[in-house]
Amino acid sequence: MTISKWPACERPREKLLESGAAALSDAELLAVLLRVGAAGKSAVDLARELLHRFGSLTALFAAQGQALAGVRGMGAAKFAQVQAIPELARRALAESLRLPSGFDSPDSVRSYLRLTLAPLQHEVFMCLFLDPGNRMVASEELFRGTLTRTSVYPREVARQALAHNAAGIIVAHNHPRGTTAPSQSDIHLTRELARTLDLIDVRLLDHFIVAGHEIRSLAESCERLPGL
């Protein structure tokens, strides 16, 4: 049965308009975005199939075209729709971090880093450059590595900080198939970054590690890094 023949109170779009987006399940929200399904398959059926196949929204949004092409009803247009969601979310969060009150909420920073780093299957080291008012002036991926490691050069981080006239920096990297527990090299790198940046009067505010849905602040959790 097509969604148009469902009772109005059960149709995802009408349910959203009546009760708000929070009242919908993940599959129902995804169905609103997809709009239509395929022959013999409603948009809700298609959404449920996608969530079942990929296991989570995070994995679905990180999926590439070839993986999605294996699902009947997922053409280029729907792939583009699915890919647009996390990118819009990242841009909205980045926009909020550029406001005067952006860094008043640590959750916004964590959410932005999760959205950016969690889906990646290789290690990435990124920097958020802040002005004296703690507004983000730039967000850049500086180094990219393999599944298990990446090489980071503190002098290049310092050079970019000067280029952006930054007063402070937040750095982050991901552990694609690991945990957020910092390695000895993570601790050593953070110390080296703090020392190098101190020479140019730029403060390293924090170093975050992202692994899946988890995120760890080394400034909050690591006793071996006093002063961050």
Swiss-Prot record:
Biological processes per GO annotation: proteolysis
Keywords: Hydrolase, Metal-binding, Metalloprotease, Protease, Zinc
Motif (JAMM motif): 173-186
Binding of Zn(2+), residues: H173, H175, D186
Cross-referenced Gene3D superfamilies: 5' to 3' exonuclease, C-terminal subdomain, Cytidine Deaminase, domain 2
SUPFAM superfamilies from the UniProt entry: RuvA domain 2-like
Superkingdom of source: Bacteria
Residue ranges of the TM segments: none
Keyword presence, Phosphoprotein: no
Coiled coil feature spans: none
Stored InterPro entries: MPN, RadC_JAB, RuvA_2-like, UPF0758, UPF0758_N
PANTHER family: DNA REPAIR PROTEIN RADC, UPF0758 PROTEIN YEES-RELATED
Record-stated family: Belongs to the UPF0758 family.
UniProt-recorded name of the protein: UPF0758 protein RALTA_A2508
Protein species of origin: Cupriavidus taiwanensis (strain DSM 17343 / BCRC 17206 / CCUG 44338 / CIP 107171 / LMG 19424 / R1)
Lineage: Bacteria, Pseudomonadati, Pseudomonadota, Betaproteobacteria, Burkholderiales
